[in-house]
Regions:
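Class II aminoacyl-tRNA synthetase catalytic cores and aaRS-like
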Residues: 1-11
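Active-site-proximal, glycine-rich beta->alpha crossover segments in alpha/beta enzymes
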Residues: 9, 13-28, 81-219
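TRNA-binding/sensing appendages of the translation machinery
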Residues: 29-70
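Alpha-helical packing segments of well-folded alpha/beta enzyme cores
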Residues: 36-48, 131-135, 176-184, 224-231
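Conserved, mostly hydrophobic/aromatic
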Residues: 4, 51, 149, 187, ...
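Acidic, glycine-rich loop-and-beta core segments that form the ion-binding/anion-interacting portion
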Residues: 213-241
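Conserved small/polar residues in nucleotide/adenosyl-binding loops
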Residues: 244-250
Length: 254
């Protein structure tokens, strides 16, 4: 019988020490970059070893360096500023008292979510280089070969960091896909698998596009898939690419 390899969606719990510094960085408060780099490297080593110890085959870095799976992009690209409007999901709109209870609970972390207010350009490539180096180093220390790094899709970025600059959302998606292509290509060129987080094909239906018809949403979804295909066109066909479509209890890997 062939072995069925095990993996997961990528993001894993950060240590309290790491979380505190990531939030300070996210809020533009003072932090020590050298200390942050050291903690990330140490925590990646720990989380890689833990995954291997429990029997996971395809290992991730746990996204230790990222404040969230989508909004980390604001730190790697020029063109974001201000703060975006927070949209409650449609299913919560239907139950306002419950929505109010959730909002008051304080259980959901508040990340900085700016808008796109200028032409997008690459700002920081060092963070990705460090992510790749940390994961490959940890894999080597633990005599393991297969690992993957998560990267946000153009569509999910546009959901959390909305367009306030480009003529229309199509132009914004095209610009995002050009920027993210660099990240996708770099991950796969370094012999790592790529997992693209794209819940925009489901999550955005009841957030960004909650007030449009099904027909209008399908047009938007087609454009997002088109841009994602363009961004991944140069990835070697022998490389595995997985796409996480849902942020609900079930995650579909294609």
């Amino acid at each position: 019988m062939d072995k069925i390899k095990t993996t997961h969606v990528g993001s894993l719990p950060r240590s309290k020490k790491l979380s505190e510094i990531l939030f300070r960085k996210d809020k533009n408060e003072l932090f020590d970059q050298g200390e942050l780099d050291k903690i990330i490297e140490e925590d990646v080593n720990k989380i890689v070893k833990k995954q291997i110890d429990i029997g996971i085959d395809i290992i991730s870095d746990g996204e230790m360096s990222k404040i969230s799976y989508a909004t980390y992009v604001k730190d790697r690209l020029h063109g974001f500023s201000g703060e975006s409007e927070r949209r409650a999901p449609k299913d919560l709109d239907d139950f306002p008292s419950y929505k109010e209870k959730i909002a008051k609970s304080g259980g959901t972390p508040t990340y900085t979510r700016p808008c796109c207010t200028a032409d997008l350009k690459i700002k920081d490539t060092k963070s990705l280089t460090k992510d790749i180096s940390n994961l490959k180093s940890a894999l080597k220390k633990n005599n393991h070969s297969q690992g993957f790094i998560n990267s946000a899709s153009p569509g999910v970025i546009s959901n959390f960091l909305p367009n306030k600059f480009y003529k229309n959302d199509d132009d914004y998606l095209v610009a995002l896909s050009k920027m993210m292509k660099t990240e996708y290509d770099e991950i796969t060129k370094n012999d790592l698998l790529l997992q693209i987080d794209c819940p925009d094909l489901a999550l955005a239906r009841h957030m960004t596009f909650k007030n449009v018809s099904d027909e209008e949403f399908l047009v938007r979804a087609e454009k997002q898939i088109e841009c994602l295909n363009e961004a991944t066109k140069d990835i070697d066909a022998s490389k595995s690419v997985s796409y996480t479509h849902l942020t609900l209890p079930t995650t579909m890997l294609v």
